[in-house]
Amino acid sequence: MKHQKRVLKFNRSGSHRDAMVKNMMIALILNHIIKTTLSKAKILRQFIEPVITRAKINTIANRRLIFAKIRNTDSVIKLFTQIGPHFYDRPGGYTRILKCGFRKGDNAPMAYIELVDRSKLVIKS
């Protein structure tokens, strides 16, 4: 009997879960929108929001902390040059989850997770 579910396991090991979240973070930073299952989108939101908050202040320490989580130089550069300055005045809530039906094979609920005001972000870049 699991009273408080602290971690959704997704039937994966811990390292596989971490790699999955890291890959989804990189994809969201580079593409501004991704399609995934609803539960994965909710987990991704928990991890990406603090990263974007830290990317609003461009210091070497923040760059190193984010690089330690993401381990992708292209996404770190994009975070600090485009996404961080774009969300500088916003106190939080950088992502939006939009439900988009069910997957054909297993009827899993699907969702788009996107950065808020992504059209303005794409025009700048």
From Swiss-Prot:
InterPro entries registered for this protein in UniProt: Ribosomal_bL17, Ribosomal_bL17_CS, Ribosomal_bL17_sf
PROSITE patterns referenced in this protein's UniProt entry, alphabetically: RIBOSOMAL_L17 (PS01167)
Ribosomal protein listed as a keyword: yes
Keyword line: Ribonucleoprotein, Ribosomal protein
A Gene Ontology BP annotation from the UniProt entry: translation
Disulfide bond annotation, renumbered to this chain: none
Record GO cellular component, one term: cytosolic large ribosomal subunit
Signal peptide (residue range): none
Pfam families, A to Z: Ribosomal_L17
Single GO MF annotation: structural constituent of ribosome
Similarity annotation: Belongs to the bacterial ribosomal protein bL17 family.
Oligomeric and partner information: Part of the 50S ribosomal subunit. Contacts protein L32.
Identification of the protein by name: Large ribosomal subunit protein bL17
Natural source organism: Blochmanniella floridana
